[in-house]
């Protein structure tokens, strides 16, 4: 909404500052963080009061979690989504369609996760919505978003897969891109969901990825920088940097309460929404493959589950002591802080590797 203050810049020249995406991105970071900092305690108290026993802990998971995690409320994603939405609505250009498409995916996935968390808490079981039903809803949301993105672009690039490291190598998938893009968004959402198993493990890599895609969005949406870096220019996507800033700020606020020992878990409400948001931004700015690099930690977690399940069904043997892979290291004797901080380091390295694709052509 503050973007509209530009209309008064002729009378108040200071309002010209709202033209700049960088300034509004910074404002979104601060707004998202302050909102969660200030409202977080109230939200946590209300969730704890309503949930009683908190998030149910899996009996077949690490036994230490039955003691250290029991009674902690979930649905903390509500804090993140609230801060993210307030920061976005306040600082983003309300006339930019990319903003609303990505925000719709984020809140849509958040609603699916919220209902899943609600089912788990009320029934005190780790089984929420059936996997098939959840995936169908996620694919419907993601497919609609990808259709809108292709229609919005109305050009060959909008339906193409861009190959990093090469100057002008693109694969035009036509309308099949809608299917591909939906898989990217749904895959990202569920990969982040699988990563969210230890205090602070998911939110920091999400913030790292958000900061990275904030930079990518700004560069892709700027014709001058895009030409200099020889990357594909997508008009209007620079505004997505503001959303990334709002997510970064809200994530910082949430980490304050999610730092071990966590006062609250983000739950599926947060993890599905944030993963879906990263996936939809990657699709919008034509950096789907780069997402697999920057979000490589999430890919690793998801692949570890796929490999574990496939191996057990085919051979009756497990590759890992427990999946996702962060539980494997728990079973090997690594402490929770060791796993979390080491995975953060991996996330930083992967983000730098992903950002390097912008220059290596």
UniProtKB/Swiss-Prot annotation:
Its EC number is 2.7.8.13. GO terms for biological process: cell division; cell wall organization; peptidoglycan biosynthetic process; regulation of cell shape. GO terms for cellular component: plasma membrane. The keyword Ubl conjugation does not apply. It is an enzyme of class 2 (transferase). Its cofactor is Mg(2+). Keywords: Cell cycle, Cell division, Cell inner membrane, Cell membrane, Cell shape, Cell wall biogenesis/degradation, Magnesium, Membrane, Metal-binding, Peptidoglycan synthesis, Transferase, Transmembrane, Transmembrane helix. One of its GO terms (molecular function) is metal ion binding. It is found in: Cell inner membrane. It catalyses: UDP-N-acetyl-alpha-D-muramoyl-L-alanyl-gamma-D-glutamyl-meso-2,6-diaminopimeloyl-D-alanyl-D-alanine + di-trans,octa-cis-undecaprenyl phosphate = di-trans,octa-cis-undecaprenyl diphospho-N-acetyl-alpha-D-muramoyl-L-alanyl-D-glutamyl-meso-2,6-diaminopimeloyl-D-alanyl-D-alanine + UMP. The keyword Electron transport does not apply. It is a multi-pass membrane protein. InterPro entries: Glycosyl_transferase_4, PNAcMuramoyl-5peptid_Trfase, PNAcMuramoyl-5peptid_Trfase_CS. Coiled coil: none annotated. The chain crosses the membrane at residues 25-45, 72-92, 95-115, 135-155, 169-189, 200-220, 240-260, 264-284, 289-309, 338-358. Pfam families: Glycos_transf_4 (PF00953), MraY_sig1 (PF10555). It comes from the Bacteria. Pathway: Cell wall biogenesis; peptidoglycan biosynthesis. Catalyzes the initial step of the lipid cycle reactions in the biosynthesis of the cell wall peptidoglycan: transfers peptidoglycan precursor phospho-MurNAc-pentapeptide from UDP-MurNAc-pentapeptide onto the lipid carrier undecaprenyl phosphate, yielding undecaprenyl-pyrophosphoryl-MurNAc-pentapeptide, known as lipid I. Belongs to the glycosyltransferase 4 family. MraY subfamily. HAMAP family: MraY (MF_00038). This is Phospho-N-acetylmuramoyl-pentapeptide-transferase. The gene is mraY.
